[in-house]
Amino acid sequence: MDYKQSNLFLFPIGLGSTYIFYKKICGTFCSIDNDLEVNPYLTHGILMLTLVYFLSDYYLMIVKYNPKHNVYFVHHFIGIVSIYFSYMKYYYLIKYLFAYLTFELSTPFLNIAIKYRNQGVYNKCSIFSELAFFILFTVVRIIFGTYLWFVTSNTLSSIEYPYNYLIVLPTILQFLNYWWYYRILKILRAKLFGCINKED
């Protein structure tokens, strides 16, 4: 889907998940007994919006297949499976799902930055978009994401067999974040010291 449609989903998903995380998960993050229901309409609404986003984008990626986007099939599949298991089978894990959904705070700024780059526009808005994306990606997906990976992996490893193998989901997702971050750093280096490779 195009960047405008994508951002219509991602802004409320990222902001809503951050609000839920801040209000009810912060401070009791490692407790499986904490009450998640900040507002049931908000929590279920964010979950439904996220599921609709993943499924619709998955469908569009199939219809408009581009081999460069194969990694997003993995990303969206992890999201869909995580929603199912955390909502239908292990509801106490849903706090981790909302923590992971805070990752989407960075994506709208990436979409905007790509739009400006494709149009060959370089102005204050494009600079702000790139800077906001880099900072948010670093803080949310790399620093917080690494911590979240360890916490989630520890919790998932204690689930009964065979569902303890769900540990592969946050592991794959975090390594995707590291791979994307490597590419981001390459682009940043090219911006500062040379030309950008169109493949990045």
Swiss-Prot record:
SMART domains: TLC. GO terms for cellular component: membrane. PROSITE patterns: TLC. It comes from the Viruses. Residues 1-193 form the TLC domain. Keywords: Membrane, Transmembrane, Transmembrane helix. It is a multi-pass membrane protein. Disulfide bonds: none annotated. Coiled coil: none annotated. The chain crosses the membrane at residues 9-29, 43-63, 74-94, 96-116, 131-151, 165-185. It holds the Pfam family TRAM_LAG1_CLN8. One of its GO terms (biological process) is lipid homeostasis. This is Putative TLC domain-containing protein L438. The lineage of its organism: Viruses, Varidnaviria, Bamfordvirae, Nucleocytoviricota, Megaviricetes.
